[in-house]
Structures are given as structure tokens and as C-alpha cells.
Amino acid sequence: MAGVFKTVTFLVLVFAAVVVFAEDYDVGDDTEWTRPMDPEFYTTWATGKTFRVGDELEFDFAAGRHDVAVVSEAAFENCEKEKPISHMTVPPVKIMLNTTGPQYFICTVGDHCRFGQKLSITVVAAGATGGATPGAGATPAPGSTPSTGGTTPPTAGGTTTPSGSSGTTTPAGNAASSLGGATFLVAFVSAVVALF
């Protein structure tokens, strides 16, 4: 019976670690999800952020004027909007990142994608260590394999609910955030060692 208790406690602590470390990102921050003045705006926005499994992207936009489509790498590169993996039209759109690898998002309204309303990110494992990935929002090299399973299909109301989520943006690399994470990690490891 003690073994079952230890196992359950360990699993609860692992789940708590994933929830604590998950971040919510408001795509574009104050600019939100709109056709940008600078075609590189969303690439610049994503650069320096580390997107992990369990993080959530929130796309805020004016209903009827924008949308969010999850697409393949080829569709991202060419702003092809005919066959998206998923398509959400009702804001806000919340997408939980639940697989590692590259993820691609575009607006399918008019020529918005061609004018820069598109986002490419690379998602790393929840427990991955290290700082922000340089150029996380940069367009991947041609021929790289796209990931098409990084999000859960949209639910009613335009919300996509992949696994693991929350709702505010904390910039990756934020000193206070990193200190809090380090403190939690020490407590977590201490608890696991004490159990076993």
C-alpha cells in the first residue's frame, strides 16, 4: 500500500510541475492577432521565447476580420489557405501546445498571411532545460519535417483546447519567472527524494 501512495504522490507532483511551468502567450502581445505593419512582426515577437509542451497560445482578434488556421509548413510558406489542419473563426482562440516540433499558424482572410499575419514556432518538451531558442519564430529551413499534430481540433466557440493551459503571458527568460521555477524545482526534487 505504501508503494501505491508513493506512486500516486509522485504522479501528482509531476503533474503539478508541468502546470506550474506552463506559460500562456498572448500572440502579438498588445498588437494582438492582426495584419501587422511590419511583415516580420510575428517572427520578431516569437524570437527569444521558448515554447514548451503545455504552454498555451491565445490569439485575440476582431471577429469577422481575422481568423486562425493551423497549417502545414508548405501551406505556411506559400500562404495556402484551402486545406488547413484546423480553422477557428471565433475569438479568442486558445491553442494548447501538446507536441514538440514546428507549429504553423496563419490568417486566411484576404492577403493577411502574405502581409505577415502568420506565426511559426518550435515547441520543445515541457521539461527541456536551457534558455529561449534564438529565432524560435523564424521560418524553418526548407525540407524540414512539419508537425501537424501539435494542437487539438477546435471546440465550439473557436477555441482549440490542446492539453495543458493557462491565460497570461510571461516572457520567456523573465528573471522573476526563472527564479520561481528554480525554487519550485528544488522543492519538487526534495519531495521526490524524501518519498523514495
Swiss-Prot record:
Alphabetized Gene3D superfamilies for the sequence: Cupredoxins - blue copper proteins (2.60.40.420)
Membrane topology: Lipid-anchor; GPI-anchor
Principal location class: membrane
Residues covered by the Phytocyanin domain: 23-125
Residue spans of biased composition, Low complexity class: 135-173
GO biological process: aluminum cation transport; cellular response to cold; cellular response to hypoxia; regulation of lignin biosynthetic process; response to absence of light; response to oomycetes; response to oxidative stress
Compartments reported by the entry: Cell membrane
Location of region: Disordered: 133-173
GO molecular function, one term: electron transfer activity
Chain positions listed as propeptide in the UniProt record: 175-196
Pfam family, one: Cu_bind_like
GO cellular component: plant-type vacuole; plasma membrane; plastid; side of membrane
Signal peptide (from-to): 1-22
GPI-anchor amidated asparagine lipid modification positions: N174
Glycosylation sites: N98
Binding-site positions, Cu cation: H66, C107, H112, Q117
Disulphide bonds in the chain: C79-C113
Highest rank taxon of the organism: Eukaryota
Keywords: Cell membrane, Copper, Disulfide bond, Electron transport, Glycoprotein, GPI-anchor, Lipoprotein, Membrane, Metal-binding, Signal, Transport
Keyword Transmembrane helix included in the entry's annotation: no
Induction statement: By dark adaptation. This gives a 20-fold increase in expression.
Entry function: Probably acts as an electron carrier.
Matching PANTHER family: BLUE COPPER PROTEIN
Protein name: Blue copper protein
